[in-house]
Amino acid sequence: MKCGFDIATFTCHAVYMNYWKRAIPLFFVVVGCSSFQKSPVHVLEVGIDVRRDVAVIDPENGNDSGWEWMLERISGADIVLLGELHDHAVGHAIQLALVEDVLDQFPKSAVAFEMLERDEQHRVDDYMDGVIDAIKLSSLTQSTNWGARGGWAAWYQPIIDAVKDRGGVVVAANAPRRYVKLARTGGFDRIDSLPKERRSLVDYPAELSGGRYRERFWEFAAHHEDSGEEEIDVTTIDPDDPLLPMYRSQQTWDATMAQSIINTKPSTERKVLLLVGQFHVEYDGGIVQELRKRMPRASVLVISIQREFPEEDWQGTPPSADVMVVETLN
């Protein structure tokens, strides 16, 4: 069963679990997939009009600039990264509304999913072509409980259906978990030793991402050891640092999703939207850095979708995102 990762939570990725039990037991709050109790709220039943009732914040000035302003920002972009909290029902409703609006205006656009892995693309294509139904798709991709028990049908399948109804493209963007694990345990050289066909399913960075993204990764990892007040210097990484293998895994996800976007040939008229956990894209995240290296002329817009204003400095340098959508101002 596949589950998700966001800024505060590692969940059931098999890549992570044994390592954390041995090396850093309290790295993040661990939420096992079995801990989800209630059925998730469906994106069509969140009880608000997300186009009207959420705040669309411009981090440059902190103003609520509105839904239409966000669509104008999107219209000038080639690539739109929708950073989510995986268990945020209203956030997924916002994603659905954005996908609908963007594909209505730019019908040749594509929507890529962190939740689907490259070797599952043929199953996605079978669904889009009517060969299999939605239940079969979630079963074959082991996605039924993505984000929460029953999360796929409530949150992600409606977005896929919106793309299908508009004649768009769905992209399985992520690296297969077995190769993410291989990057962690064997290093990137081990990835290069794969036969050509399997090697095409995964990418890794030429150089590990730095800046605030790297700092945040180490800060969250070290938080269980102290108050978090001590500044962490990760300008260089000790080869023996126990977090380095985990960062290789993280960066394998980043690089693979970035290259999946590029392979889809994004442009202003044929946009690629990526649904992905916030951590990968916020504060000049790993995917953003990889896109800049691999496709430097692309116009990339990062939209961070929040339940409430984050405590972290979202207007700093770099800011959390180009646009921040907030469910509640309380």
Where are each of the predicted segments found?
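C-terminal regions of proteins
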Residues: 39-46, 256-267, 273, 278-330
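Membrane-embedded segments
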Residues: 86-101, 108-112, 118-128
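Sec-dependent signal peptide recognition
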Residues: 19-26
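Zymogen propeptides
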Residues: 62-63, 67-104
